[in-house]
């Protein structure tokens, strides 16, 4: 817990109120010191700064020494004396620069599991000649450095610490040098810091950051040391970043532990210390706040902590640049700060607590509305009824519902929503509608935070609602307002995740191909699509449109360099461009090998419930004409997860949505929601595969829908978050993070892989293998239940296991595992066909220069200069390619870009084209 105090010594550095944040335990110990030595005034601002900028253990140890002294001349003097005796210039930079100054000694021949006493303190160091004692004024050199750092704009301070490269601050720079750079423009500042400190680090590319979110990153090593990375710019932001400000949020990645460390009694002790004490960035302290795993799409492929994003937030600072500006969380504990986002303490379990609190991490675009002017109405969910009109209950005894996740929004608010939003990012420019006549989005996937409640789901346009109105259902409300906190302020906002957008041509998936094959779709259907697609992909080498489309799609791989070359008129047979296009073709073929076949007359549309109640149990609406459609939802595994439904036009829908489109409506009739029948789906933003492909509909024969046969969910019986102390809750939440990040359940991936391996063999068996097929089908149904249960387990904290009797260790060859068998199913045929085409395309192409550039005259001076320059480049690049550092090659490229352009790139360069062109021409002819 962080606390602040009033500075009673108003003459101290001119402060009358100082928000010098101390951990709660340190503040408590300080009060005990005041109680014993009560004839002394409270300590000065500078002394509080010193206490706030060190670890909790060291601060408590120092104050205990003071408490145990019989007589004290001055509190400030004795505290400073003890601190100077314990902390060195190199002892603190571990917290300042993000890198441990020393490696603690280990006993030769032994793997030490338990930290020694010297290791426990985050900013202590063994005695050494490097101690710098305090001067006459009681300030040591490192405090002077940190104060200078604290005068910088945070973006500049963070960049400087990033460029330190593991060195301690005092080794490489002085406070006067830092102050000299303080007022430089960012580009000039970066250049000065780079040449002074960072030539061994990856260089920052200072692109235009207007409107972009700054992600400040920190990587923590198993020994507890950490290094800063970034900042990185993205077009998308989170509710957390928008409320606190980008620089008050630190994205933290904890590295995997060495295998030998996992056998220790407490292998994550260093990480727990970080969570408890926080991370110091200069004079700022950041503490653990929230984490989020990669979501359903990432769970199957997760094999490291990279997908588990952990966020620390700023809880205190003694930097002068921060103390001049108010901070929204000043004086709050972590527990209080979370309550201002949502009343998450009301939830039943710590697992549910963190799962729901992570809603603030969704990538969103803020809807610019005054939340106090919006009427939020709660309406009932639409229950599923049997033929006697009684509620139908699920396996847990709760009513089944048709409307899971869907509410309504008034037309005026919908018109304020941007169009074409996907995961918080605008897919097209100039998409803010305002009062334009264009139709508003039909469906808006949202996160709404209002008076302590948290709402997740979609809003369907409803033209019948009064202005400034939204309607939410209980199925959408993930966190309810705590009625005991009626006067407690909250960070209210309506955030847009995704809108219903014009659909692109859909692709199949491995699971869908397997299920369609099981349902009677012949192999020739898939192979015809594959062969036609392979032929079209080859046009990438001789059709500018095809090449440009591919270069744009994969533009993030090369900063759109290939696209710029194509747009500049560079011939497609230019060696580098041709080589790069061949890489893109391989990526496209890899998609095909994985079963991602493009299919005509098929789309992915966001699903919702029919507001009119007119659709029958086997009908959907949203397509222009009445016809049968095939409906599926990824990542469905059950034979009945593919439905054949009748697409029907409902005239009365226009009263609700007008001409808005790009969604699919499911009925609100029947004993069970159609969405739930399709791989346990709902209507909070799920995308459904809709196909009216005539050949698919001709051949596919549907199966009975999925019904869970697993037992009812276990009810959590542990202590609720509200029953835990703040300290206990923080410890419990970080345990959940460690379990999620470092011991992730492999059940999801193993169940899916085992299902596919069994399904592959099932598809190749003839009708004569009745018993074997029946046994295999039984296993697949069991795996399906396990898979669906495991996907939802993190919300409840339920543990799901994979029994050995359904676990597979021999896989079809296209899954590319260690132990494989040769598959002859449709998926094996697809894989082999693409491999055969890859073998045909391996003929190497010669390297030649473009005649137009060879014919132009080049000065001898430029040629000689570029020869030397290129020689140095080749030498450094060879060294980088032979190193173990993945970033080394990119660092060399960035270095030489900087030398060529005198900037991070062409766009940022102030050099005119006439100055760059002769050098570029010489360089082209040298190589």
Swiss-Prot record:
Residues 121-135 have a biased composition (Basic and acidic residues). It is an enzyme of class 2 (transferase). One of its GO terms (biological process) is regulatory ncRNA-mediated gene silencing. GO terms for molecular function: RNA binding; RNA-directed RNA polymerase activity. Keywords: Nucleotidyltransferase, RNA-binding, RNA-directed RNA polymerase, RNA-mediated gene silencing, Transferase. InterPro entries: RNA-dep_RNA_pol_euk-typ. It comes from the Eukaryota. Its EC number is 2.7.7.48. Belongs to the RdRP family. Probably involved in the RNA silencing pathway and required for the generation of small interfering RNAs (siRNAs). This is Probable RNA-dependent RNA polymerase 4. It comes from Arabidopsis thaliana (Mouse-ear cress). The lineage of its organism: Eukaryota, Viridiplantae, Streptophyta, Embryophyta, Tracheophyta. The gene is RDR4.
